[in-house]
């Protein structure tokens, strides 16, 4: 099982259409990947200004971006039988999601789902920046998950 908490930029839990989509697509991704461990994670919806600030402070990159993932290191995770293991936190810029949906000529829902799945895979240890093979594997998996969910390009 995957427990997803969706928060706004004021750390209030959300239950709107965006939050429902992200929870559903991440639950689908969890099942698609046949994960056995119970996990918990947070998804934070922010604007470009906030994600720029986070990117600058934690990644030394002075610009806004679409999604940032902060995975808990395996050694930092607490393992208790029957209790969901904390994966980490995602920050998704809704400003970027809207702009990229227009740029890539697909729906906002598809872009938001893509960013959520992309970040989720990073939390699981996938890293497209390591090599071309790692990029092909991660992006291929993202596409299969989104297509399986019914969100095509």
Curated annotation (Swiss-Prot):
Q: Cofactor note, please?
A: Binds 1 zinc ion.
Keywords linked to the UniProt accession:
Cytoplasm, Endonuclease, Hydrolase, Metal-binding, Nuclease, Ribosome biogenesis, rRNA processing, Zinc
The record's subcellular location field reads: Cytoplasm
InterPro entries, per this entry? MetalPrtase_cat_dom_sf_prd, YbeY, YbeY_CS
The EC number(s) this enzyme carries: 3.1.-.-
Set out the biological process GO terms recorded for this chain's protein: rRNA processing
Q: Which cofactor does it need?
A: Zn(2+)
Function comment: Single strand-specific metallo-endoribonuclease involved in late-stage 70S ribosome quality control and in maturation of the 3' terminus of the 16S rRNA.
* PANTHER family in the cross-refs: ENDORIBONUCLEASE YBEY, CHLOROPLASTIC
Record protein name field: Endoribonuclease YbeY
Highest lineage ranks of the organism?
Bacteria, Bacillati, Bacillota, Bacilli, Lactobacillales
